[in-house]
């Protein structure tokens, strides 16, 4: 049971990280390797977006740490399908959170249902 709990925490962290990264980069101007990255005024004026991106990257790091615990307690063939749940959670969150403004379709929803069914098939007891 410990492995599934660590896996779920990892998946939730990845989901939050994806949402933060998406929000952060969408609210930044066009990304390029210009000198503006060294301009304090530019950095300060985009601090909220940059903090979101950094928090998203930190979320990925924490997720990997949790994933190591997942692998410690679960066989890989049971643990790895859990990662697919992040697709489901991200889809649900962008459907619920209006500022992402993403389209939800019947076909995409069917895909999410297939993912859930696949995770269930792989994870059930033998």
Swiss-Prot record:
Report the main location listed first in the record. membrane
SUPFAM superfamilies per the UniProt record, alphabetical:
Multidrug resistance efflux transporter EmrE (SSF103481)
Q: Where in the cell is it found?
A: Cell inner membrane
Q: In which pathway does it act?
A: Bacterial outer membrane biogenesis; lipopolysaccharide biosynthesis
Its GO CC terms? plasma membrane
- Keyword DNA-binding belongs to the record: no
List the InterPro entries hit by this protein, alphabetically: Flippase_ArnF, Small_drug/metabolite_transptr
Please list the residue ranges that the record places on the Periplasmic side of the membrane: 26-49, 101-102
Q: Name the GO terms of the biological process aspect.
A: lipid A biosynthetic process; lipopolysaccharide biosynthetic process
Ranges facing Cytoplasmic side = 1-4, 71-79, 124-126
The residue stretches assigned to a coiled coil in this entry are: none
- Specify the protein's topology with respect to the membrane: Multi-pass membrane protein
Q: Which GO terms describe its molecular function?
A: carbohydrate derivative transmembrane transporter activity
Give the stretches traversing the membrane.
5-25, 50-70, 80-100, 103-123
Keyword line: Cell inner membrane, Cell membrane, Lipid A biosynthesis, Lipid biosynthesis, Lipid metabolism, Lipopolysaccharide biosynthesis, Membrane, Transmembrane, Transmembrane helix, Transport
* Family designation: Belongs to the ArnF family.
Matching entries from PANTHER family are given as:
4-AMINO-4-DEOXY-L-ARABINOSE-PHOSPHOUNDECAPRENOL FLIPPASE SUBUNIT ARNF-RELATED, SMR FAMILY PROTON-DEPENDENT DRUG EFFLUX TRANSPORTER SUGE
**Quaternary state and interactors:** Heterodimer of ArnE and ArnF.
What does this gene product do? Translocates 4-amino-4-deoxy-L-arabinose-phosphoundecaprenol (alpha-L-Ara4N-phosphoundecaprenol) from the cytoplasmic to the periplasmic side of the inner membrane.
The name this protein carries in UniProt is: Probable 4-amino-4-deoxy-L-arabinose-phosphoundecaprenol flippase subunit ArnF
Organism equals Photorhabdus laumondii subsp. laumondii (strain DSM 15139 / CIP 105565 / TT01) (Photorhabdus luminescens subsp. laumondii)
């Amino acid at each position: 049971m410990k492995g599934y709990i660590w896996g779920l925490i990892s998946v939730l962290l990845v989901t939050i990280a994806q949402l933060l990264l998406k929000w952060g980069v969408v609210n930044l101007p066009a990304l390029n390797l210009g000198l503006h990255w060294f301009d304090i005024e530019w950095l300060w004026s985009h601090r909220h977006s940059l903090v979101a991106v950094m928090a998203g990257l930190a979320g990925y790091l924490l997720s990997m740490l949790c994933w190591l615990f997942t692998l410690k307690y679960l066989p890989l063939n049971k643990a790895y399908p859990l990662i697919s749940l992040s697709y489901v959670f991200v889809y649900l969150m962008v459907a619920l959170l209006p500022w992402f403004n993403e389209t939800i379709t019947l076909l995409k929803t069917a895909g999410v249902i297939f993912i859930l069914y696949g995770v269930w098939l792989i994870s059930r007891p033998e």
